[in-house]
Amino acid sequence: MIVQRTAAPTGSVPPDRHAARPFIPRMIRTFAVPIILGWLVTIAVLNVTVPQLETVGQIQAVSMSPDAAPSMISMKHIGKVFEEGDSDSAAMIVLEGQRPLGDAAHAFYDQMIGRLQADTTHVQSLQDFWGDPLTATGAQSSDGKAAYVQVKLAGNQGESLANESVEAVKTIVERLAPPPGVKVYVTGSAALVADQQQAGDRSLQVIEAVTFTVIIVMLLLVYRSIITSAIMLTMVVLGLLATRGGVAFLGFHRIIGLSTFATNLLVVLAIAAATDYAIFLIGRYQEARGLGQDRESAYYTMFGGTAHVVLGSGLTIAGATFCLSFTRLPYFQTLGVPLAIGMVIVVAAALTLGPAIIAVTSRFGKLLEPKRMARVRGWRKVGAAIVRWPGPILVGAVALALVGLLTLPGYRTNYNDRNYLPADLPANEGYAAAERHFSQARMNPEVLMVESDHDMRNSADFLVINKIAKAIFAVEGISRVQAITRPDGKPIEHTSIPFLISMQGTSQKLTEKYNQDLTARMLEQVNDIQSNIDQMERMHSLTQQMADVTHEMVIQMTGMVVDVEELRNHIADFDDFFRPIRSYFYWEKHCYDIPVCWSLRSVFDTLDGIDVMTEDINNLLPLMQRLDTLMPQLTAMMPEMIQTMKSMKAQMLSMHSTQEGLQDQMAAMQEDSAAMGEAFDASRNDDSFYLPPEVFDNPDFQRGLEQFLSPDGHAVRFIISHEGDPMSQAGIARIAKIKTAAKEAIKGTPLEGSAIYLGGTAAMFKDLSDGNTYDLMIAGISALCLIFIIMLITTRSVVAAAVIVGTVVLSLGASFGLSVLIWQHILGIELHWLVLAMAVIILLAVGADYNLLLVARLKEEIHAGINTGIIRAMGGSGSVVTAAGLVFAFTMMSFAVSELTVMAQVGTTIGMGLLFDTLIVRSFMTPSIAALLGKWFWWPQVVRQRPIPQPWPSPASARTFALV
């Protein structure tokens, strides 16, 4: 309770206007108008000579890709090896039809591909799977109504060149007229990032409007004065314009880089901080005026009581945000310098422009006079309760903190940026169209490359390549693996060993009828042989008869020779007797004319032939005897010949049976082999995969090689699709398994020792997850150390600095837990992975401000004793700090209107943290700890628990004062 007590009526003593004043506030007050004009000129120059912050952010946007991450290194190396470009920016163009895509859609697609390939400035390469028959089925949906092509763009994701490339691709697509019923979407990671930046820039103006609306309402509620609120808004607007202009100037001249997150956070943080500092300054000025000080004294009291707090607060925020520069992820790294520079500008404006405006406006009547007394009594009652029951109040504050802390174990994060962007963004619409026909992972694949020291375009290495693909496909959660051995995600048809064997029997199948005809002709030969056998048997019978006849003829001829010789002898006797008569016939000249003569002469000539005949018969007899000898031998040979013919017949029949059975068996085997090959093909079983060497000369296959093997054949890549969302925790967890599977698959093979590179969506977010953990640790520890040092310098107390930092950490955990409770468990939206790091750094910095102001005020009042100092500090700073905290909290919560859900989550998390810090930590927890620790709170400083007794002031120096 405050009691106004007045000393004896000896007259008040006017303040000494010639007393020594601090140099800096005196110079600011003296040159207030030039300072204001200087700031106005600077602000005008900065905002006129360079474009606005949003425009500069678009022009000088930096890449959000972590270049040092293994996945980024892998993707760039893959692009270099395959000669497809050196950027990490890729877009997907999706064609969706109401009916299966036909020739018209394909013609449009070919025309679009030609236009894209012609734009070498923005398009580095294409993966034209749909245009190649070998891989077409892999790029078209199962219902035939959608197809896609991947385009590698110039510039890394997030850079102005990448965003320009996305716009160039969109322009090319928009200028082409698709067939009726076909829609074309430009989507993919690069398009999503570009749309995110545009959405963030659109949201920034809305956020600024909502923020100023919130600030105006809060200021009017707190100060109940339009003029005071207008003056404070002027200070805030000028500070914001200076910050925007300064950062835009540095960004425009490429001194610093900017991102969507940096510009959004910078604007809101600058507004909130500038508002806080304006509240600190004007609040302390009005408090001094309320205690009876004149305007000049109140000005110096204001500056002396808040300048070090504003400086410490600003340096804390600037230093903590600058610690983000030590991180490795560009998402955080790009925030560090812009936010730190922006906060330095805000602090500079608050410590120069703010006091100058107060110095000028305080000279004009009652512009800054308090319209009502500050609510000191209520806050002093809170301070008195804390001093009286510090333990229970501290326990109650900790219990409230446990509400959020107990929620933290259930915290889950999400890496899918699509879930945090409006569904009507063009890139999101493209993703939605793709997901109507493809799995979610098809648009976000992984790419694994194995790089060896030799050319892999041979059958042996292709066996290993297929082994790698099978090993990756066997990893749990992998739904599809595309490689040269499975271009469309399934094994190439007719590449199993059983099928190749069945194909080798194709020629046998073609000659089967011919062989069967030849076998059938063997029966004809058997019939011919049988006919020969029959004839031979008849010949044998005839030969036997001939032998018998010949033998009889020899016997008869032997007798005939004797008879003929006897006949010759008798004729010789006759001739000897009639020789004289015979001679007459030869002497007669006219014997020819005398018939009797010529007849008798002819008889005698005939008798002369008996000798010749006898001689011939004698010569014939040995021959007949020889024939008589041979004929039995010939007859004896005939049965053997007949038996041989019969044996030939039997062999021919046996051969026929064998050939016929063999042919039937081969036909059956061919049918089994063909059935086995067809079964292996139908089952997509590539356990016995093999590509014969002649396949590598096939022109179609060579086109497929270009897609999956590097130009020199030393590297092969695999396109991997997950089951479900690759950006989920489960998808991220598969990355290590994929690498392990590939590494194990090449053990003991010709590819052992080859380098393995893995990039893609889940791989990148795994690196982001790992980097986020590392960056959070680095930024958090460095920010805590920096904040502790600043608090130590400001309070000159190790314990007080430790308490401030400790309570801020506790507040951070509680507020983040509350954010998890609201967003994850109530709204059903998991917190984006960026939220934790951004909220932690800003809450660490901003949360320490209000504790710092409280402890600084407590330090001013400590001469009255610890307990009394706590009560006075609570009464003097309670309303100001609460107003500042509420304004800052609701200002950050204005992010809730952003199109970027991640910024809404960051803003609400920081806002809830500031509310908890303002209403619980600063109001109850920190003063309770100070009351419990007593003089140890100020160690190593020495303070008294109670004030040193002093004599009652003399009447001559009596003044109106306040007693507790």
UniProtKB/Swiss-Prot annotation:
It is found in: Cell inner membrane. The gene is mmpL5. Belongs to the resistance-nodulation-cell division (RND) (TC 2.A.6) family. MmpL subfamily. One of its GO terms (cellular component) is extracellular region. Part of an export system, which is required for biosynthesis and secretion of siderophores. It is a multi-pass membrane protein. PANTHER family: MEMBRANE PROTEIN MJ1562-RELATED (PTHR33406), MEMBRANE PROTEIN YDGH-RELATED (PTHR33406:SF6). Keywords: Cell inner membrane, Cell membrane, Membrane, Transmembrane, Transmembrane helix, Transport. The chain crosses the membrane at residues 31-51, 203-223, 230-250, 255-275, 302-322, 340-360, 389-409, 773-793, 803-823, 826-846, 880-900, 923-943. SUPFAM superfamilies: Multidrug efflux transporter AcrB transmembrane domain. Induction: Repressed by MmpR5. Repressed by iron. Regulation is IdeR-independent. This is Siderophore exporter MmpL5. Interacts with MmpS5. Can also interact with MmpS4. It comes from the Bacteria.
